[in-house]
Amino acid sequence: MKNNVVGWFEIPVKKMERAISFYEKVFDLKLDRHKMGPLEMAWFPWLEDKSGSPGTLVYHPEYYEPSVDGVLIYLTAHSGDLSNELLKVEAVGGKILQPKTEISAEYGYMALILDSEGNRIALHSRQ
């Protein structure tokens, strides 16, 4: 297979400003915001020639609803140790659902959080 199966992911939000603030502060990054009529998106940084899939926060009053159920997205902790990102979650309106837990020596660690919009999101790191 030459390409990843996942084209991109969308994380539903109710309040774009609040969601952007949450993700920028937890992951120490800048989202790229776009508005197309009633559809609003804020894209995570990504490079086309690197591994992983691009993703965006998305708001549309008719088509998207944040949820703790359903698909689970794993976001890479760019600090290298998801403990660093977990330290910021509650301070910016999120909740830790499952603390840092070892998956295995080979695959590293994961944690589950509830973001500022009510979405269940997983974090992953090798350390």
Question: Where does each model-flagged region fall?
Answer:
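N-terminal beta-strand motif that seeds the catalytic metal site of vicinal oxygen chelate
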Residues: 1-20, 70-73, 125-127
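Domain-length accessory/inserted modules outside core catalytic folds
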Residues: 50, 62-68, 75-79
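Vicinal oxygen chelate
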Residues: 15-16, 73-117
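Short beta->alpha transition motifs characteristic of CBS
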Residues: 104-107, 123-127
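Active-site beta-strand termini and strand-to-loop segments that position acidic
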Residues: 44-49, 113-116, 126
